[in-house]
Regions:
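Bacterial N-terminal signal peptides that target proteins for export
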Residues: 2-14
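Bacterial N-terminal signal peptides
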Residues: 11-23
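N-terminal ligand-binding lobe of clamshell/alpha-beta domains
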Residues: 26-274
Length: 274
C-alpha cells in the first residue's frame, strides 16, 4: 500500500516543480517602469538582468528613436531587440562630450570613472580640471571637432554625447562606426528644470545606481518645489532682462525661443521684460 502513495507524492512534487518553473519564467519576462515624473524624452523598462532605455526625442523634429540595453555583467543578452545598442554594466570608464553630463556624474559620485571630456573650457569642476592637468582625463576636442584618434586611444567603455539631427554637428554616427558604445543624452529637449534633472536616472543606468539616482532626484524635487512655493507667495515679482555674453560683448534677446527658459520664468512667477 505504500508504493501508490509514494508514486502519488512523486507525481505531485513534479507538478509543483513544473508550476514553479512556469511562474519563474513568467516573472522573468515581466518588466517594471521606474517612476519618471517630469522627463518626456526617454522611457526606462527594468527587467531582472537588464534595463531597456528608449530615447524618444533625441533632437527637435526627430523622426526616430534610440534604444539601449543595459545588461548586467556576466548575464546573457536578452532576445528581441535587434536595433538596440548593448552596454554592459557597471561601466568602468566613460567619456563625456557635453559638460552638462558632468553634473550627473558628480552627484552619483562617479567622476572617478571619467577618462575623457570635450570642451574643457566650459568645465567648472575643480576635480575634472585637476584630472585634465594631471593627464588622467583626456581633452578630446571642442564643439563638433572631436579628436577621434585621442578618444580611441582612451578607449572608454561608453561615450555620452548629444545630437541635433545635423550631420555636420553630430558625432554619434562616427563613434558608432568606430565600434564605440555611444549613449545620446537629450536632456536639453526637456522644457522644465525637473525634467532635465531627471536625466540623472539615465546616467545611473551605466553604474547600476538606479536606487541612488531616485534618492538624489527625490531630494532635488523636494527642494525645488519648496522654493517655488516660496516664490509664489512673493508680493513683489522682479522683472527679467534676458541676454547672453560672449567675451566682452553683451546681447539682449529680442525673443525667447527656449521653452525651458520661459517655463522656468513662469514657474517662479516672474515677469519677462525683453
Amino acid at each position: 500500500m505504500n508504493r501508490p502513495i509514494r508514486f502519488f507524492s512523486f507525481r505531485l512534487s513534479l507538478t509543483f516543480a513544473a508550476l514553479l518553473l512556469i511562474t519563474a519564467s513568467g516573472a522573468a519576462a515581466q518588466s517594471t517602469a521606474p517612476d519618471i515624473k517630469y522627463a518626456t524624452a526617454f522611457t526606462i523598462q527594468s527587467f531582472d538582468t537588464y534595463r531597456l532605455l528608449t530615447v524618444t526625442r533625441p533632437w527637435r523634429g526627430a523622426d526616430r528613436t534610440f534604444e539601449y540595453l543595459f545588461v548586467k555583467r556576466g548575464t546573457p543578452d536578452p532576445e528581441g531587440y535587434p536595433g538596440a545598442q548593448r552596454i554592459e554594466t557597471p561601466v568602468s570608464s566613460v567619456a563625456s562630450l557635453a559638460a552638462t553630463h558632468l553634473a550627473f556624474l558628480g552627484r552619483l559620485g562617479t567622476l572617478d570613472r571619467l577618462t575623457a571630456i570635450a570642451n574643457p573650457q566650459y568645465v567648472s569642476s575643480e576635480t575634472v580640471q585637476a584630472g585634465i592637468a594631471a593627464g588622467t582625463i583626456a581633452a578630446v576636442g571642442n564643439g563638433p571637432d572631436v579628436d577621434l584618434e585621442e578618444l580611441l586611444s582612451v578607449n572608454p567603455d561608453v561615450v555620452t554625447t548629444f545630437a541635433m539631427g545635423k550631420s555636420t554637428k553630430d558625432d554619434y554616427q562616427q563613434l558608432l562606426s568606430l565600434g564605440m558604445k555611444t549613449l545620446i543624452f537629450s536632456d536639453y529637449m526637456e522644457e522644465t528644470p525637473l525634467g532635465r534633472a531627471e536625466w540623472i536616472k539615465v546616467m545611473a543606468l551605466l553604474f547600476d545606481q538606479e536606487a541612488e539616482a531616485e534618492r538624489i532626484f527625490d531630494d532635488i524635487e523636494r527642494r525645488y518645489l519648496a522654493l517655488t512655493e516660496i516664490s509664489a507667495k512673493l508680493e513683489v515679482k522682479p522683472s527679467v532682462i534676458m541676454g547672453s555674453s560672449s567675451g566682452t560683448s553683451r546681447h539682449l534677446c529680442h525673443q525667447l525661443e527656449s521653452p525651458f527658459i520661459t517655463t522656468e520664468i513662469r514657474i517662479i512667477q516672474q515677469t519677462i521684460r525683453i
